[in-house]
Amino acid sequence: MKKLSVIFLSVSMLSGIAFADKDKVVATYKGGEVKESQIMKEFKPQLNLQSGETIKNFDDFPPQDQEKLIKIYVNNLLLKEEVAKSNITSSKEFQEKLENAKNQLAQQELLANYIKSNITDKMFDDEYNKYVGNLKGKEQIKVAHILVKSQKEANNIKTKLSKGGNFTKLAEESSLDKASASNGGVIGYILLNQPGQLVPEFEKKAFALKVNEVSTPVKTDFGWHIIKVLEKKPVPIPTKEEAKVTIDNILAAEVLKKYISDLEAKADLKIMLPKAGSKAGS
């Protein structure tokens, strides 16, 4: 029994040593050193949330990202030391800002907890079914465009295209929409009448085009567009998992709107401003 205890103790010690060896020092600075575990503890939750992937080890990051994370971590430590040396946190102005920040953070936490506790599985399922129902039978199109300032410029580009000009090349050379210009003018897939996508004038013209057809110049608040439809296909129906973020956001907005409305009603809120269109004192 005594031998077993010794063996167990030895194995435990060796395991501890092996684990310690894995926690490599990745940087040193005056006053300390930085280990992999410190970087992971600081950044892992946030990075997993942003990337949507599970990052387990420091070595999972590319070398350039490892260096960035180390520098961010050390810079935070150095700035923390500088703050400690100063008397900035004792000033009245800082305390007021701190109190405001605490209040905002507390409100955000309150709302997040309220939303989480007031969205049921049934609500999610109902909203998902509604969302999917709206997508069934709909078509999505892949569009590209060239954006210019004037109708004259748009007409010139349309003429060049009619004479065999290359849409991709002209978009790269002429489009004011630099984000899509770098990709040959390609915006991506859009659905008709989806809030937050594109302006109505653009959508109306785009959905009237056939595949590979190029539009006449279209005016919007952004300028003049030449639109090309690259592809048309049915909208894919997402699974619950694929639609989770979208459905959660829809439900959160609905729950939050009702919560704020109820608070205003309980507070008997009355806005004393004159109605729109009426003159003060009339």
UniProtKB/Swiss-Prot annotation:
Main localization, broad class: membrane
Reaction catalysis annotation: [protein]-peptidylproline (omega=180) = [protein]-peptidylproline (omega=0)
Coiled coil: none
Keyword vocabulary terms for this entry: Cell outer membrane, Isomerase, Membrane, Rotamase, Signal
Domain PpiC span(s) in chain numbering: 138-231
Residues in the signal sequence: 1-20
Cellular localisation: Cell outer membrane
SUPFAM superfamilies associated with the record: FKBP-like (SSF54534)
GO cellular component: cell outer membrane
EC assignment: 5.2.1.8
One Gene Ontology molecular-function label: peptidyl-prolyl cis-trans isomerase activity
InterPro entries found in the cross-reference section: PPIase_dom_sf, PPIase_PpiC, PrsA_foldase
Family listed: Belongs to the PpiC/parvulin rotamase family.
Protein name: Parvulin-like PPIase
Organism: Rickettsia felis (strain ATCC VR-1525 / URRWXCal2)
Biological classification of the source: Bacteria, Pseudomonadati, Pseudomonadota, Alphaproteobacteria, Rickettsiales
Designated gene of the protein: plp
